[in-house]
Design a protein with these regions (language model features):
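Regular, well-ordered alpha-helical segments
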Residues: 18, 26-29, 45, 49-52
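Conserved catalytic core of two-component sensor histidine kinases
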Residues: 10, 37, 44
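Alpha-helical interaction segments
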Residues: 14-17, 22, 39-41, 59, ...
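N-terminal single-pass transmembrane signal-anchor helix
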Residues: 1-24
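Periplasmic/extracellular, small/polar-rich flexible segments of pilin-like filament-forming proteins
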Residues: 45-111
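Aliphatic-rich helix starts adjacent to a transmembrane/signal segment
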Residues: 23-40
Length: 111
């Protein structure tokens, strides 16, 4: 193998490695988005469970921890009780570096 062939092989491996690193970052971001959505669904179930037990929606995350809710590390959950019968939940990264997702109890949708 000549020096030129070796340099070509090293260049190709470098290009493939840079593509792979970008893809891994994209997959990690998608996985974290899925974690935030999952946390919202679980928190909504915990809110309903709390309501079933205490006949009101809680204002704090500490309250839904009592009924079994556990969030993913690195996900910040915000609870906003908009009326006695409705609430919204927002999941985001604490540093705000990614999108946030919001669950609305009136529609049951995550946006």
């Amino acid at each position: 193998m000549t020096l030129l062939e070796l340099l070509v092989v090293v260049a190709v491996v470098g290009i493939l490695a840079s593509i792979a690193i970008q893809q891994v970052s994209l997959y990690r971001a998608r996985a974290f988005d899925a974690s935030m959505r999952s946390d919202l669904k679980n928190a909504a179930l915990a809110m309903e469970s709390y309501y079933g037990e205490f006949l009101e929606y809680p204002n704090t995350q500490a309250a839904i921890l009592l009924v079994g809710y556990r969030n993913t590390s690195g996900v910040s959950l915000t609870i906003n009780v908009t009326s006695p019968s409705t609430f919204t939940l927002t999941a985001a990264r604490p540093n705000g570096s990614q999108l946030s997702f919001t669950y609305d109890s009136t529609t049951g949708l995550i946006n």
